[in-house]
Regions:
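A short beta-strand-turn-helix
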Residues: 29-48
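Short active-site neighborhood of thiol/selenol oxidoreductases, capturing the structured segment around
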Residues: 42-65
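Positively charged n-region of N-terminal signal peptides that target proteins for export
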Residues: 1-4
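Hydrophobic h-region of N-terminal signal peptides that target proteins for export
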Residues: 9-18
Length: 169
């Protein structure tokens, strides 16, 4: 019994350590634009990208921080661009309604927003369960995940985000 328990604890420790390592080799993913046409992630491989992966049911989660990032231009620079991806698979709202609302907003602010109708991005990048989550990711042009926050962002995560993003702008 002790051997089984020890093996289980060792396995958990190994999984915890590997989860803490940055993900590398992330690939571009084909999603949909707001007109439901195929679209690849913009600037992938050309610039570092800041991805706001949002469940529309929780679009206000981290709203203040997202606005702060926009106002202080943290996602803008010679080497970095940001855009949004709507996690439509996990939303209870009709996809057409969400796209219409998003199109109207992007016409006003010029933002780029894509739609993930089948969790393609979450699965391809190993994000796990993103239902009811606001996921913020910084991906290098080489395909390495430099920063990720899921759910309500903490003050410590905000500080870490600014520390990391400053190096890549």
């Amino acid at each position: 019994m002790k051997k089984i328990l020890f093996t289980f604890v060792a396995l958990l420790a190994t999984l915890s350590l590997s989860a803490a390592e940055p993900k590398t080799g992330l690939q571009n993913v084909e999603l949909k634009n707001l007109k439901n046409e195929p679209a690849m992630l913009p600037w992938y491989g050309e610039k570092h990208i800041l991805v706001f992966y949002v469940d529309p049911d929780r679009h206000k989660q981290n709203e203040d921080f997202a606005r702060e990032i926009e106002e202080n231009h943290a996602a803008q620079g010679e080497n970095i661009e940001g855009f949004g991806v709507l996690n439509l698979k996990d939303s209870m709202l009709p996809n057409g309604l969400i796209r219409t609302i998003a199109r109207k907003r992007t016409e006003k602010n010029g933002a780029i927003v894509l739609a993930d109708t089948d969790r393609k991005l979450a699965e391809a990048w190993g994000l796990g369960d993103c239902n009811n989550q606001f996921v913020l990711m910084l991906i290098s042009r080489e395909g390495e995940m430099l920063f990720m926050s899921k759910g309500e962002i903490t003050e410590e995560q905000k500080a870490e985000f600014y520390r990391v993003v400053t190096k890549y702008r």
